[in-house]
UniProtKB/Swiss-Prot annotation:
GO cellular component term of the entry, any: cytoplasm
Family annotation (Gene3D superfamilies): Aspartate Aminotransferase, domain 1, Type I PLP-dependent aspartate aminotransferase-like (Major domain)
Lineage: Bacteria, Bacillati, Bacillota, Bacilli, Bacillales
Record's subunit section: Homodimer.
Organism listed in the record: Bacillus cereus (strain ATCC 14579 / DSM 31 / CCUG 7414 / JCM 2152 / NBRC 15305 / NCIMB 9373 / NCTC 2599 / NRRL B-3711)
Gene: argD
PROSITE patterns referenced in this protein's UniProt entry, alphabetically: AA_TRANSFER_CLASS_3 (PS00600)
Protein's name in the database: Acetylornithine aminotransferase
Family per record: Belongs to the class-III pyridoxal-phosphate-dependent aminotransferase family. ArgD subfamily.
Additional record remark: May also have succinyldiaminopimelate aminotransferase activity, thus carrying out the corresponding step in lysine biosynthesis.
Binding, pyridoxal 5'-phosphate: 96-97, 123, 208-211, 266
Coiled coil: none
Length: 386
């Protein structure tokens, strides 16, 4: 069949028609264990009953109205996002790229400066601003010239950070775990030094939690585990559990820098998105839920290390919460395909890392099942190495 779609994705031929919890079913009736969560989107699993109920009820009332009018649902969700943290204001949008664009605009407007420091191998989006911020050449090929005033330093390199920081820097933007860059957690000392230098030079500290946010690492936001206070946090992906919604969250001192007309979004924060986000947050903020995520993350990481430690092709296993990377000594495309054949959906992060992003509602039994399948595949001599 002739496709009328731009070929912007390296799509697999499989098509899914049903999803419930951690499982999805293709159009031939085969069931899969989904350890992609739609690339970290469906943290509560597919068709979560609480989120489904909230969205269905909202569909009967009102779907969308202009942001020129009051929306109390936005206020409710904003309160849930800022509760018990040193962040006071929220701007709602539709995606992680939009949230990061808003953060970059706010940083420049608030500080009056233009230079932004980010990290090599980072990923912040595909708009011109966020693409310029991203530290991966493959994302930028063919789209130049990009926006000036972005510096990219090696991830976790304090010396490189110290060399570029000065009074001209508007902001430093960093991920707590580089997801697209290979599932590489940030060093605590690196984050602390960013905070110190931003305070010293009057720069804003932006943390991109688009993939790590909403409980993925065992706290609502990953940065909460390391005792720092960023000026801006961005979030999207899991905030709507499949309904497009993003948010840029800023400190109180930034509140006067975005005024009427200085930024906006037609669809951002509409009623359907807010209905989903409200239910997602009410589930994801529960201490018992987050504790289980931490425990399951520790459990599966330990199981993977135990089962794969002597496998020749495995170089490293790392992660934070239920965000895990299995680094191999060669490219993993053939592994990804074979895992799919065995009924396990996983992701690739760079050429040689298998990325696991299971729904946070996953059971220990399902984690064990995934570990078994992964071990079976990586130990199979018939898997081609490319």
């Amino acid at each position: 069949m002739t496709s009328h779609l731009f070929q912007t994705y390296g799509r697999r031929t499989i098509e899914f028609v049903k999803g419930t919890g951690t499982k999805v079913i293709d159009n031939k009736g085969k069931e899969y264990l989904d350890f992609t969560s739609g690339i970290g989107v469906c943290n509560l699993g597919h068709c979560h009953p609480t989120v489904l109920k909230g969205v269905q009820e909202q569909l009967d009332d009102i779907w969308h109205i202009s942001n020129l009018f009051t929306n109390s649902l936005q206020e409710e969700v904003a309160s849930l996002l800022t509760e018990n943290r040193a962040l006071d204001y929220v701007f709602f949008c539709n995606s992680g790229a939009e949230a990061n664009e808003a953060a970059l605009k706010l940083a420049r407007k608030h500080t009056g400066k233009s230079l932004v420091v980010t990290c090599q191998q980072s990923f912040h989006g595909r708009t011109f601003g966020t693409m310029s911020a991203t530290g991966q050449d493959k994302v930028k090929e063919g789209f130049g010239p990009l926006l000036p005033s972005f510096l990219h330093i090696p991830f976790n390199d304090i010396k490189a950070l110290e060399e570029v920081m000065n009074e001209e820097v508007a902001a430093v933007m960093v991920e707590v775990v580089q997801g697209e860059g290979g599932v590489i957690p940030v060093d605590l000392s690196f984050l602390k030094e960013i905070e110190t230098l931003c305070n010293k030079f009057g720069s804003l500290f932006i943390i991109d939690e688009v993939q790590t946010g909403i409980g993925r690492t065992g706290t609502l936001f990953a940065y909460e585990q390391v005792g720092i206070e960023p000026d801006i946090v961005t979030v999207a992906k899991a905030l709507g559990n499949g309904i497009p919604v993003g948010a840029m969250i800023g400190g109180k001192e930034l509140g006067t820098s975005f005024t009427a007309g200085s930024h906006g979004s037609t669809f951002g924060g509409n009623y359907i998105a807010m209905a989903a986000a409200k239910e997602v947050l009410q589930v994801s903020k529960k201490p018992s839920f987050l504790k289980e995520v931490q425990e399951k993350g520790e459990y599966v990481l330990e199981k993977l290390q135990e089962e794969l430690q002597h496998v020749e092709c495995i170089q490293n296993i790392r992660g934070k919460g239920l965000m895990i990377g299995i680094e191999c000594k060669h490219e993993v495309a053939s592994f990804i395909e074979q895992l799919e054949n065995e009924g396990l959906l996983v992701l690739q992060a760079g050429p040689n890392v298998i990325r696991l992003l299971p729904p946070l509602i996953v059971t220990n039994e399902e984690l064990e099942q995934a570990v078994y399948i992964i071990k079976k595949v990586v130990c199979t001599k018939n898997v081609s190495i490319i």
